[in-house]
Amino acid sequence: LLEEKNAALCDVGSLGAVVPGSIDASGETVLDAHNLDFHNVPLRKLLQEQFPGIPVYIANDANGAALAELYKGAFTGCKTGVLLTLGTGLGGGIILNGKMFNGGMNHGVELGHAYLVDGGEPCTCGNHGCMEAYCAASALTREGRRAMQAHPESMLAEKTGSDPAKITPKLVTDCAKAGDPAATGC
């Protein structure tokens, strides 16, 4: 990135890193980022070792996105805002009275791990029935695979040669847009 911007390390005022998971209250350690298989990773220390002399900050990805919206985006001039992220996981960041809401245990809005369905689909966190297990990219992939197996005549099967490993969220979405009944049911 420095090369791309024609900058040197001495030009960097601080470094911010965001991760899809829970950060401890001190902002030092990634407690759990299941999609990355990070558990109790001292990320701030690791980055400080790689970039000595540069202040390092770590945060939850959705919280970082909400702060970016507060300082430079849609929340500029607002005291309150709610941001939802949807991709590999499901998260959220809340700005209250101009400040990041981190919750009682500093986990912010781990919306993806809110309990939704009793005995439901497995989640990356190890629980079953979390919201993320139903609406994140992994859920779309899972449902696309199920739909392809149940409908061997589907566009999903045709485009992948019936190989479940070739199902992606983009493919499911593209097939649904093209009118594939199997994909539209995902």
Language-model segments: residues:
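Glycine-rich phosphate-binding loop and adjoining helix at the ATP-binding site
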Residues: E3-L15, G21-T80
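Short glycine-rich anion-binding loops that position phosphate/pyrophosphate groups of nucleotides
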Residues: P20-I23, G87-G89
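Short, ordered coil/turn segments that flank beta-strands lining enzyme active or ligand-binding pockets
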Residues: A25-S26, L96-N97, K177
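Glycine-rich phosphate-binding loop plus the immediately following alpha-helix
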Residues: I58-A62, L116-S154
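Glycine-rich phosphate-binding loop of actin/hexokinase-like ATP-binding domains
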Residues: T76-C135
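A mobile "lid/hinge" subdomain adjacent to the ATP/sugar-phosphate binding pocket shared
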Residues: Y134-C186
